[in-house]
Amino acid sequence: MRPLSPSEGGGWVRVLSIVALAAIWELAIWAFEPNHLPHLSKVAEAFWELATTPGPWSCHRDTNLFWEIISQSGLGCNLGFTLFRAGAGFFSAMIIGSVIGILLGRFRSLDRFFDGWIVLGLNLPALVVGILCYVWFGLSEFALILALAINKVPLVAVMVREGAASIQPELIHVAKAFRLSWFQTLRKVYLPQLYPYFMASARAGLALIWKIVLVLEFIGQSQGVGFQFQIFFSNFEIEKVLAYTFSFIAVVMLIETFIMRPMDRKATRWRM
């Protein structure tokens, strides 16, 4: 018999893994109070209630039932707010961090001068950055997105810097010999070499941003998943906390499965 490839049967393995996790969850309830660790059926009921109950505000109206649930429910709107903030902070940090990383990787004098700044940025607590941004710019969307970008830029810059520094000088000389413009050199020389580093920084940064955005919403916003966690924590509604958690994780896994993994496979195709 031909052995299964990693892609074949992988779906069944993931399903069995989720079923095993659900079984462990139900068994763990025996050791805890149901109020502290509710049954999955209670979490499902809380999810349906949150998904079908309108929040204090609505995004927009739609006649389609699916989009009605997404846009008119508190769950759908809060997920939308959080995803927008995370996406804005992510793309801002990727652009700024990539530019900084390329410059540091190609110009050693800049790298030596700003190396201490990068180390400081990498070790600066995310919560401190968030509090300072809220103090300086108010409890606004701009302050939250700025805090997300500041926390992620050093990570992107470090990874892209390593890629830019590893580009062979001969390739740059060839580009100059063929009199390529700076844009053509960037597109034909730098970007193909840096693509794996872009993907590594994107995946690492995305994992970081998902965690930070919830904390910043918890302490300084009036919409979003983090803000809902604050309300449910105050009311000790554990099943609703878990309902929002599983919903958020599901969205993150969809992004990872259908966007990040295909792009990552493209980045590492040359290794096959």
Please name every model-derived segment.
Residues 115-152, 162:
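Generic hydrophobic transmembrane alpha-helix motif, especially the helices
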Residues 1-19, 257-272:
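Transmembrane alpha-helical segments of polytopic membrane transport and secretion proteins
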Residues 2-3, 31-91:
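Periplasmic/extracellular loop-to-transmembrane helix junction in inner-membrane transport proteins
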Residues 155-201:
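Short cytoplasmic-facing helical segments at TM-TM junctions of multi-pass membrane proteins
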Residues 225-263:
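Hydrophobic alpha-helical transmembrane segments of polytopic membrane proteins
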